[in-house]
A protein has these predicted regions:
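Noncatalytic scaffold domains of N-terminal-nucleophile
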Residues: 1-31, 35, 43-229, 233-235, ...
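Extended C-terminal subregions enriched in glycine
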Residues: 337, 434, 467, 476-522
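Internal maturation/activation junctions in enzymes
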Residues: 299-396, 408-409, 416, 521
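Short, well-structured alpha-helical segments that form the helix of a local strand-helix-strand
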Residues: 44-51, 160-171, 241-244, 307-324, ...
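Short beta-strand scaffold segments in enzyme catalytic cores
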Residues: 62, 66-74, 378-382, 442-444, ...
Length: 553
């Protein structure tokens, strides 16, 4: 079916309620989370219920084969975070993966769009890129254990209770939404994997909008997790299927790799931006990039420019450019290498000096004082009547991930390992047990003691750029919550160009400043969700570029 998702723009209003609020990219998933709140669960229970439902109704973006991160503010005012992100298998060394790439008959299929690499001969690992698809791109999935840990440590209901709506959608069926049908149509790697074809195609075709589908295999796996707990994924039947599938396709993951995984609770990192405190997760993800960009933008007064001016976009984009260069150079798994304090105000002052009236060409990495353009991810935000707020993000990285579905489980496995490098001295060089650089970044903002928001912007390297723009829209320009998400966006791109939405008013002025401006489709500018609690009132806003919905009671 041919249709244009972006032909017309629909108007949305922010949603207000006091009993509870859920905002996410799929209405059916939002309703699943809301049902848990109505049944007495708290925001954390509802977050897992919503995430599980998204696994079913938005399977192009998320699932049990991926990872999950959470950033939250509890009813008593504590700000915390959880990382459920696994690492590389114990046998996944640079040498082993490089040899496998050179010798495997199907290695070319692991590199979409002829990425260019050496397959035959040569001893230099620099000739090789880390595979983007296939068994070596799969790291230990953290989602199942992350869901279980969230409910056990922060929730009030059982895992079986919160998984029930998702299981019902998977077994009984649901109508596919417009945006998800669009992405489902564009998943060509499914056609090369028998288990994926059986689990996610219907009479050999992706579903059309409104078509009712069932995902029985996935639903059966979820029911097993509900009955037996996450151990079945890491030590039992489902884990055995994951390890066997990866090994059958030439990878190294074992049941022992899966069994060794545990989620972690971490101290968030934060900075202030024009009086608002913004909290992010610490490395191994992009949180520090967002904070560094906010600090640089504050230092140069980026938010002082008129909203419609090219000077505003130029200033913020240059701050983002420098933060990306630094983040991609320094951020790695902190258990393997120390990550410097990129979020310090002093470092931002040094970096701000490089920004002028024209774009920086070939920016150099800063030295802190210290001792996929597109990606498929889901984000949800939840608030409850007790005062809990949570930003919860779940992803397999690129679409259906590695292109591998684990046997008859219906679980599509992520390709986060594609972020590793096969160059030994690279900050994100592949090492056994090491966690890859992660794009997932949920966020919390504190405007004052009685005014907090859980928010985020899904979408690969758009995520920290989206955080910067949403916070500035709220803080610098006084926008309402839905307005801040509706506003036209820009994004700095890896090739040095500046992508903008067609409705961004500053395009011509940016070209005059020397920017190489490209008009991009709205789907490349991320998907934001936000729930704000001001005094005792919850306000929800959702991404107009997605199918999403904010619902409250």
């Amino acid at each position: 079916m041919a249709y244009d998702l972006d032909r017309f723009t629909s108007r949305r209003s922010a949603v207000h309620a006091t009993g509870g609020m859920v905002a996410t990219s799929q209405p059916l998933a939002a309703q699943a989370g809301l049902s848990i709140l109505r049944d007495g669960g708290n925001a954390f229970d509802a977050a897992v219920a919503t995430a599980a439902a998204l696994n079913v109704v938005e399977p192009t973006s998320t699932g049990l084969g991926g990872d999950v991160f959470a950033l939250y503010r509890t009813a008593d005012g504590e700000v915390g975070s959880m990382r459920a992100c696994g690492g590389a298998p114990a046998e996944a060394t640079i040498e082993n993966v490089s040899q496998s790439v050179r010798e495997h008959d199907d290695a070319e299929s692991w590199y979409p769009e002829a990425r260019g690499y050496a397959v035959d001969g040569g001893d230099e690992n620099e000739d090789l890129e880390m595979p983007f698809l296939g068994p070596h791109a799969v790291t230990v999935p953290g989602t199942a254990r992350g869901w279980e840990t969230t409910v056990e440590e922060l929730g009030t209901l059982s895992l079986a209770d919160v998984l029930e709506p998702a299981i019902r959608y998977a077994i009984d069926g649901y109508p596919v939404s417009e945006v998800i049908s669009y992405y489902w149509q564009g998943a060509p790697r499914l056609f090369t994997d028998d288990h994926a074809r059986e689990a996610y195609l219907f009479e050999e075709e992706p579903p059309d909008p409104g078509q009712v589908v069932t995902l029985e295999r996935l639903g059966e796996s979820m029911q097993k997790i509900a009955d037996e707990g996450a151990d079945i994924v890491y030590e039992g039947e489902i884990g055995e299927a994951i390890a066997a599938e990866i090994q059958d396709q030439g990878g190294f993951m074992t049941l022992e790799d899966l069994a060794a995984f545990e989620p972690e609770f971490l101290e968030p990192v934060s900075t202030t931006y024009n009086g608002t405190e913004v909290f992010e997760l610490p490395p191994n993800n992009q949180g520090l990039i967002a904070l560094e960009a906010l600090n640089i933008a504050e230092e140069i007064g980026a938010g002082d420019h008129p909203y419609d001016s090219p000077e505003r976009v130029h200033a913020f984009a240059e701050a983002m450019k420098l933060a990306f260069v630094d983040g991609h150079h320094y951020i790695t798994d902190p258990e393997y290498e120390t990550v410097p304090p990129l979020a310090s105000k002093a470092f931002a002052r040094e970096r701000a000096a490089a920004i002028g009236d024209t774009p920086i060409q070939d920016p150099e990495v800063g030295v802190p004082t210290n001792a996929a353009e597109d990606a498929d991810t889901v984000l949800l935000t939840v608030g409850d009547s007790e005062g809990n707020l949570v930003s919860y993000i779940n992803s397999r990285f690129a679409g259906f991930g590695s292109g591998i579905v684990a046997g008859d489980t219906g679980i599509a496995l992520q390709n986060r390992g594609a972020s590793f490098s096969l160059t030994p001295d690279h900050p994100n060089s592949l090492e056994p047990g090491k966690r890859p650089f992660h794009t997932l970044v949920p966020a919390i903002a504190k405007f004052d003691e009685d005014d907090w928001a859980a928010f985020g912007v899904m979408g690969g390297y758009m995520q920290p750029q989206g955080h910067l723009q949403v916070i500035s829209n709220l803080v610098d320009y006084g926008m309402g919550e839905q307005e801040a998400l509706d506003a036209p966006r820009w994004r700095y791109r890896e090739d040095g160009t500046l992508g903008v939405e067609e409705r961004l008013p500053a395009q011509t002025g940016l070209v005059r400043k020397g920017h190489d401006v490209r008009i991009l489709q709205p789907s490349l500018f991320g998907g934001a969700q936000l729930v704000r609690r001001t005094d005792d009132v919850l306000t929800g806003a959702t991404e107009p570029r997605k199918d999403g919905q904010a619902v409250g009671f």
